[in-house]
């Protein structure tokens, strides 16, 4: 009996060591993957004059989706240990526009899809007027479809702002609107948007902010949004997350935006 217990204990130790090794490897991978994968989309010292944001490379979406994995029951997952990947150029741009703020939106691509949106958010960028209708904007992958018994607000899709209206005052801008599920919009993006808005309104100062829709291949619907924020003068206020563009109970075809009820 005692020999069996010693053997079992040794097996458990070996198993624990293997698990620890795997976790350390995954942690190192997550820590190093993103800086190597990301382009410096906002090296504005060179680009600001002509207003260019370079879209991410084609394989970037595959790297992101491989790292974050499939939806697992939570609307968000941390990326790069929660640390955003803003460059020194981004921070210099923040310092230049620390009071009045700054916003830059990528041009739509050949499929009509949004690219990254970057901003230096301040009280000056927040809206002072009532929000108007955005119903005339039809972002890529848009369909008007309802699941009344699955979704409290009935409709599967919202026109989701990459940079929220409450933060930017930017409303019916096609370069700032993607097709997102109600779940992405309300459970995923809204809590982070409110967190940033509260920080600024309570005197926290300027915040660097980037929202990157992640499209796989020629998909018209983004698989999710990579969201980063960092206070210009307070590095303790920051986050870096991936938000899943899913809707529990609904199966989505990301190539077209079509959907059906899960069996």
Locations of the language-model features?
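Polar/charged alpha-helical tracts
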Residues: 14-15, 62, 66, 222
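Hydrophobic single-pass membrane-insertion segments
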Residues: 30-42, 230
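Domain-level detector of nuclease and nuclease-like folds
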Residues: 88, 95-263
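Residues in intrinsically disordered, low-complexity segments of regulatory proteins
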Residues: 17, 33, 40, 101-104, ...
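Hydrophobic membrane-insertion alpha-helices, especially the h-region
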Residues: 16-31
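N-terminal, intrinsically disordered, polar/charged segments of Gram-positive cell-envelope systems
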Residues: 37-94
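N-terminal Lys/Arg-rich, disordered targeting/topogenic segments
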Residues: 1-13
């Amino acid at each position: 009996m005692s020999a069996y217990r010693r053997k079992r204990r040794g097996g458990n130790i070996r198993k624990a060591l293997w698990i620890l090794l795997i976790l350390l490897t995954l942690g190192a991978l997550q820590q190093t993957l993103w800086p190597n994968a990301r382009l410096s989309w906002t090296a504005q010292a060179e680009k600001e004059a002509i207003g260019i944001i370079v879209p991410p490379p084609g394989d970037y979406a595959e790297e992101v989706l491989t790292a974050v994995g499939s939806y697992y029951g939570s609307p968000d997952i941390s990326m790069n240990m929660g640390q955003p990947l803003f460059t020194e150029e981004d921070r210099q741009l923040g310092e230049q526009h620390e009071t009045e703020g700054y916003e830059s939106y990528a041009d739509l691509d050949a499929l009509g899809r949004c690219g990254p949106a970057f901003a230096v958010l301040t009280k000056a960028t927040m809206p002072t007027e009532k929000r108007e209708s955005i119903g005339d904007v039809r972002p890529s992958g848009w369909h008007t479809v309802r699941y009344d018994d699955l979704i409290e607000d009935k409709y599967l899709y919202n026109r989701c702002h990459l940079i929220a209206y409450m933060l930017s005052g930017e409303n019916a801008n096609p370069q700032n609107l993607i097709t997102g599920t109600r779940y992405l919009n309300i459970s995923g993006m809204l809590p982070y948007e409110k967190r940033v808005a509260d920080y600024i309104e309570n005197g926290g100062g300027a915040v660097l902010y980037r929202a990157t829709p992640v499209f796989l291949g020629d998909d018209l619907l983004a698989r999710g949004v990579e969201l980063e924020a960092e206070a210009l003068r307070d590095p303790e206020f920051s986050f870096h997350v991936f938000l899943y563009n899913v809707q529990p109970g609904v199966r989505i075809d990301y190539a077209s935006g079509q959907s059906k009820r899960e069996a």
